[in-house]
Structures are given as structure tokens and as C-alpha cells.
UniProtKB/Swiss-Prot annotation:
Gene Ontology CC: plasma membrane
Keywords: Cell membrane, Membrane, Transmembrane, Transmembrane helix
Protein name: Uncharacterized membrane protein HI_1307
Top-rank taxon: Bacteria
GO biological process, one term: amino acid transport
Annotated localization: Cell membrane
The species this protein was found in: Haemophilus influenzae (strain ATCC 51907 / DSM 11121 / KW20 / Rd)
Length: 210
């Protein structure tokens, strides 16, 4: 049962989306501390959705259909806003000595964790994933120890996956490539965020209306 959970969740994580683009961009352009904080935020978001799924997220959406639409509308709006800011970026990243220290001084751990959390919570793809695919996996988990273990598996696997992604994109070759093409990478990532956001807003409005 837990093996099925690990496999299903791994494939869910491997599907490219806002979380992946956020972590890879942070790893290539920001400090290690800030990137890990972002990963912690995303992991907290996954933990939140995982807990809701175990408490009957799918049943809640069936009982209150408009709730799903509201979540998609709010999440889509935030993603679209992030996408707009990134899509209009005209600056190239510059990596200098002590850049990690400078990055760390420009923000706080709390702010970076919150950024990662908001990126995940605003991603309605995660909502659909946990309310449909993951619910089918978790439906047979009824014992308290199984619930605790399943929750731990989801949280640990999420953090480990994105930490590995951050290690890959924080390598010097990745930083050089990002520095050289950062404007275009940010613009493309922004377009992806904007697309996700607009689709979610559109679908959210449709669900609320109907």
C-alpha cells in the first residue's frame, strides 16, 4: 500500500508545474538557504492538501461544488500575477562573490517559506491531484498508524524530490546558463505561470457560475 503511495506521489511530483519551475529558478538564481526555505513552503502546502485529502477533500467538493471553483479562482489569480511579473522581466541575473550572503540579507526565512507555500497553495493542479488521484490511493488507509505513516511519506518524499531538483539546478553550469539566458527563462516561466493562472481562473469562474 505504501509502495503504491510512493510511486503515485513520485509521478505526481514529476509532472512539470509551478512548483517545479519555482524551485529550479530559485536554485539557479538565489541562495541555498532561500531555495530550501521555498522547498519547505511547498512541502507545507503539500502537507496541507494531503491532510485535507485524508479528511475527505473529495467529499467536501461534492457537498460544496462552488468551493472548488473559489479555490481555483483565487489560486489562478495569484499564479497569473506571478506570471505577469516574470513575463515582463528585462533583467539578466548576475552572480557575484558573496551573492548568497547578499540574497539572504535581502529577505527573511519566513518570507521565503511563505512564498513557496503560496506558490503551492495557489496551484489548483495540486487540488485536483489530491481530490482525485491521491484520494483513490488513500481511500483504503483507515488505521491511525497508516494515516500517520502515509502523511509522513508524502511530506518527506516531497521535500526530498524538490531538494534533489534544487541540487541539480544549483550547479555552476546551471547557474552560468541561467545567468546567460535568465531573462528569457524568466519570461518563459512567466508565460507558463500566466497560462496556468488564466486557465484556472476561467475554470474557477465556470464552476462557480454553474
Amino acid at each position: 500500500m505504501m509502495l503504491n503511495l510512493i510511486i503515485v506521489h513520485l509521478f505526481g511530483l514529476m509532472t512539470p508545474g509551478p512548483d517545479f519551475f519555482y524551485v529550479s529558478r530559485m536554485a539557479a538564481s538565489n541562495s541555498r538557504r532561500n531555495t530550501v526555505c521555498g522547498i519547505l513552503g511547498i512541502t507545507l502546502g503539500i502537507a496541507f492538501w494531503g491532510m485535507l485529502s485524508m479528511l475527505g477533500l473529495a467529499v467536501l467538493f461534492v457537498t460544496i461544488p462552488a468551493l472548488h471553483g473559489v479555490i481555483m479562482l483565487l489560486g489562478g489569480s495569484y499564479l497569473a500575477y506571478l506570471g505577469f511579473l516574470m513575463a515582463r522581466s528585462k533583467k539578466y541575473a548576475k552572480f557575484e562573490s558573496h551573492s548568497d550572503t547578499e540574497f539572504n540579507q535581502q529577505t527573511t526565512i519566513k518570507k521565503e517559506i511563505l512564498k513557496g507555500l503560496l506558490v503551492n497553495l495557489s496551484n489548483a493542479k495540486v487540488v485536483v491531484y489530491f481530490s482525485s488521484v491521491m484520494s483513490l490511493v488513500l481511500v483504503n488507509i483507515t488505521e491511525m498508524w497508516q494515516i500517520i505513516l502515509a502523511f509522513a511519506v508524502i511530506v518527506v518524499e516531497t521535500f526530498c524530490y524538490f531538494y534533489v531538483i534544487s541540487l541539480i539546478f544549483s550547479r555552476n553550469i546551471a547557474k552560468r546558463l541561467y545567468s546567460q539566458y535568465s531573462r528569457y527563462i524568466d519570461n518563459m516561466a512567466g508565460i507558463v505561470f500566466l497560462f496556468f493562472g488564466c486557465v484556472l481562473v476561467y475554470n474557477g469562474i465556470n464552476e462557480i457560475i454553474h
